[in-house]
Amino acid sequence: MDFPCLWLGLLLPLVAALDFNYHHQEGMEAFLKTVAQNYSSITHLHSIGKSVKGRNLWVLVVGRFPKEHRIGIPEFKYVANMHGDETVGRELLLHLIDYLVTSDGKDPEITNLINSTRIHIMPSMNPDGFEAVKKPDCYYSIGRENYNQYDLNRNFPDAFEYNNVSRQPETVAVMKWLKTETFVLSANLHGGALVASYPFDNGVQATGALYSRSLTPDDDVFQYLAHTYASRNPNMKKGDECKNKMNFPNGVTNGYSWYPLQGGMQDYNYIWAQCFEITLELSCCKYPREEKLPSFWNNNKASLIEYIKQVHLGVKGQVFDQNGNPLPDVIVEVQDRKHICPYRTNKYGEYYLLLLPGSYIINVTVSGHDPHLTKVIIPEKSQNFSALKKDILLPFQGQLDSIPVSNPSCPMIPLYRNLPDHSAATKPSLFLFLVSLLHIFFK
């Protein structure tokens, strides 16, 4: 028997195993680099920028083509530890990485997910804040803010009121990152409550603020996404697990209904980055003891995986001219779901629209031409981890040079301030709301 090989075989699982401890910057970097080295065919590790103190903002990409976008494969992301003292999400994402890479080729569900999705994972958006926590606390610790004492979840441009704060390096890095990828779906992991919160976080009368809520044109989809996560977390779905705190029916809330906030990241993603993002509050205690981490992983594992799958909801495709040339930067939206910042095709002419099962009219608009309408019917179940594929051929030859490369209709100003007080686009009908709830129930 070859004893050195035997000992090496026994040792490798121990080296590769990720423990349930809090990983500071050095330990987190070591783990991420080891994963990137050992699973180089399905991972790509890169930094999107640096914190105020010069710490790298690491992102690990997991996918069959991790280093670049492939047409038809949607981009998904998880971001955690935006508040440095909210720590559970940071560790859950490290364990999610470990689970994904070690399950590839063994678990058919995970293998299919990696084949069909490009998954971006940022364990810590605020590494300076995490390192600043000297005494972990359930309620508040120095470290929530970044090194310059800015709350990063109040630091983004706001669509409802002017947010004249100094944009921080971590925020700027994320904003630039969002421009480099065609993100479709995202979640932002926090702590201090147990709830899945969906946009809007801020609001005006036109979005329902008079009714203590602020709803997007895609409210049915957002409610479905939030319920998808919460319903698979045994404690979150109770809605009242955190004592002496607000109760959340079924573990879900509209952000504005909970409490309004200015400059939040999930609203910025939805309005300016064409990315549906919700906020996940994962623990009643912001910085729980390490021995609690295994139970947090067990309670969130199924939710984390199922939520990634939702990037395949709805319809996707490319827009072509009559000669088969893809058309970038053209408006592609669903009739009666107009976004205040119109959603546009990427440089490959691709579009991704998250939609629940049903019948919809897609409206494609190119400057100088009549709108092109296409009817689609979204089936009850996505096929093989893929949204319905619907390419759209426009009956003219595209003049690519005349199509703007940026979106002039979407300056980073309070776009909603100029809306009329009552906008049908931002108030989903009661029928649509009930249909979405029935869909969630039967799912």
Swiss-Prot record:
Catalytic activity entry: Cleavage of C-terminal arginine or lysine residues from polypeptides
- Active site: residue positions: 281
Give the glycosylated residues: 38, 115, 164, 363, 384
Residues that coordinate or bind Zn(2+) = 83, 86, 190
Annotated cofactor note:
Binds 1 zinc ion per subunit.
Its recorded name reads Carboxypeptidase M
Top enzyme class, one word, equals hydrolase
Obligatory cofactor(s): Zn(2+)
SUPFAM superfamilies with a match to the protein in the record: Carboxypeptidase regulatory domain-like, Zn-dependent exopeptidases
Q: Which residues form the lipid moiety-binding region (GPI-anchor amidated serine)?
A: 423
The reply to whether Nucleotide-binding figures as a keyword in the UniProt entry is no
Could you tell me the gene encoding this protein? Answer: CPM
GO BP term, pick one? peptide metabolic process
Q: Output one GO MF annotation.
A: metallocarboxypeptidase activity
Pro-region residues? 424-443
Q: Superkingdom, according to UniProt?
A: Eukaryota
Which cysteines are cross-linked by disulfides? Answer: 138-285, 242-284, 341-410
Similarity annotation: Belongs to the peptidase M14 family.
